[in-house]
Swiss-Prot record:
Membrane topology annotation: Peripheral membrane protein
PANTHER family: ABC TRANSPORTER I FAMILY MEMBER 10 (PTHR43514:SF4)
Subunit architecture: The complex is composed of two ATP-binding proteins (ModC), two transmembrane proteins (ModB) and a solute-binding protein (ModA).
Pfam families the record matches: ABC_tran, TOBE
Domain of life: Bacteria
Gene field: modC
GO terms for cellular component: plasma membrane
Protein name per UniProt: Molybdenum import ATP-binding protein ModC
E.C. code: 7.3.2.5
Binding site for ATP: 31-38
């Protein structure tokens, strides 16, 4: 568990945090440039020193301004992956990985190398590596120090799109197979969508929102970040069944289900899906003989006018689902809070 209760002033920027983060999964730190994202992880890593408050990791005090405690970075057991890989140019990849490696990780070396897909790189110098390869090595080096927490400061920011696509699957594998909590700084919605379990949104050094990805994604805090065509819902589901006759898989959402193209996933596997608001239409009665496979009973929570369109907030199985309709449709259906209706879902995408 990471307890953050501190304030820090750097020049004209003030960062104030009072949050507790669980000791598992990936927490994305999101916000515009200058919001305080890098300042936050620099304070956690010991690269900067808060003027007030405390930082506690798994019961160990890293910072306590009142008591004058400030552990040096090497004593914090915190790994740090920078935007630029910062590998030692005169060491081969193997030497970079072994530099600072904890004794407890010696037996894990081969497994981690395989997990990151860097076996073919071990005898090469950093200068011969692509940007994505360098970042994989940097992540491996950080993990081999046996950290209790891994900090990643926009590790994909300096990569072109093909290299980002190359690295994302490795990061997804890490989240599943390495039981180390991570703080992932990014201003990329796509990266957050594919990697994060939780999101902390920073603005001018203050926390504007913090919680599970699907909750923060559906909140008003994220609206300015999502263009109209990308307004969507993120929902947690589990694999319910595979159709006996068609290449389709049913996903449980509360006591209802959604059909998607067949997935190579076991029953009860937890997944995350994304549904675009523009792919949700509303009807008052369950449709008959329709090609749309997914029709969910839903309750209207609220509706909001948005530049000639209406965003309708729905509750389905205790989760939030957004629909975008016209003012004409709103008036004709008499949309109001508490109304029960049916949401027709045209398309579902799997995000994680």
């Amino acid at each position: 568990m990471l307890e953050l209760n501190f304030s820090q002033t750097l020049g004209n920027h003030c960062l104030t945090i009072n949050e507790t983060l669980p000791a598992n999964g990936i927490t994305a730190i999101f916000g515009v440039s200058g919001a305080g994202k890098t300042s936050l992880i620099n304070a956690i890593s010991g690269l900067t020193r808060p003027q007030k408050g405390r930082i506690v990791l798994n019961g160990r005090v890293l910072n306590d301004a009142e008591k004058g405690i400030c552990l040096s970075p090497e004593k914090r057991r915190v790994g740090y992956v920078f935007q630029d890989a910062r590998l030692f140019p005169h060491y081969k990849v193997r030497g970079n990985l072994r530099y600072g490696m904890a004794k407890s990780m010696v037996n894990q070396f081969d497994k981690l190398v395989a997990l990151l897909g860097i076996e073919p790189l071990l005898d090469r110098l950093p200068g011969s590596l692509s940007g994505g390869e360098k970042q994989r090595v940097a992540i491996g080096r950080a993990l081999l120090t046996a950290p209790e927490l891994l900090l990643l400061d926009e590790p994909l920011a300096s990569l072109d799109i093909p290299r980002k696509r190359e690295l994302l699957p490795y990061l997804q594998r890490l989240t599943r197979e390495i039981n180390i909590p991570m703080l992932y700084v990014s201003h990329s919605l796509d990266e957050i969508l594919h990697l994060a379990d939780r999101v902390m949104v920073l603005e001018n050094g203050q926390v504007k929102a913090f919680g599970a990805l699907e909750e923060v994604w559906g909140s008003s805090v994220m609206n300015p970040w999502l263009p109209k065509e990308q307004q969507s819902s993120i929902l947690k589901v589990t694999v319910l069944e595979h159709h006996p006759h068609y290449a389709m898989t049913a996903l449980a959402l509360g006591d209802q289900h959604l059909w998607v193209n067949k997935l190579d996933e076991p029953l009860q596997a937890a997944l995350r899906i994304r549904i675009q608001a523009s792919d949700v239409s509303l009807v008052l009665q369950p449709p008959q003989q329709t090609s749309i496979r997914n029709v969910l009973r839903a309750k209207v929570v609220n509706s909001y006018d948005d530049n000639g369109q209406v965003e309708v907030e729905l509750e389905v199985g205790g989760k939030t689902l957004w629909a975008r309709i016209s003012p004409w449709a709103r008036d004709e259906l008499a949309i109001k809070p508490g109304l029960w209706l049916y949401a027709q879902i045209k398309s579902v995408s799997i995000t994680a």
